[in-house]
Amino acid sequence: MDERILEFIKNEQLLSWAMIDEKGVYTASAFYAFDEKNLAFIIASHEDTKHIRLASENSSIALNIAKESKIAFLKGVQAKAEFKMASKEQMKIYFSKFPFAKFDKSAKIYALELFWLKFTNNALGLSKKLEFYKK
C-alpha cells in the first residue's frame, strides 16, 4: 500500500461503514486502530447492535474516512472490506490505541479487512486518486 495512504489512515481514528439491511444500506460510525500487517481496520462494538448483526450476516462492507470540508484540501478514503472477528494480535493493537476500551467487557473487537481502497488527496491535484487492491 502506498505510504501516503498509510500515513492518512494512521493519522485518523474515526470511520463510517455501511452494510446491507432488508431495505438497502445501513451505516454506522466507529473509532478504529489500523493493523498494517493484515491491512485491516479494527473496531469495537456490541454483538447485539444492528450494524454488527448485519455485517455478521453479509460480511462484505464498505467504509469511508473523510477529512476537511474545503474541496482543495479534501483527503479521504473509500474502501471495500470483509467483516471478521479480530485476531488476538489485532485486539492488542486496538487496546494499545484505546486502553479505556478494556473496561467495556461486553464489547467485542472486529476487523474490517481491506481488499480495495481509493485514496483522494486534492492537495495532489483534483483528479489524482491512489488505488489499492489486495493481492
Swiss-Prot record:
<protein>
    <recommendedName>
        <fullName>UPF0306 protein Cj1449c</fullName>
    </recommendedName>
</protein>
<dbReference type="InterPro" id="IPR011194">
    <property type="entry name" value="UPF0306"/>
</dbReference>
<comment type="similarity">
    <text>Belongs to the UPF0306 family.</text>
</comment>
<dbReference type="InterPro" id="IPR012349">
    <property type="entry name" value="Split_barrel_FMN-bd"/>
</dbReference>
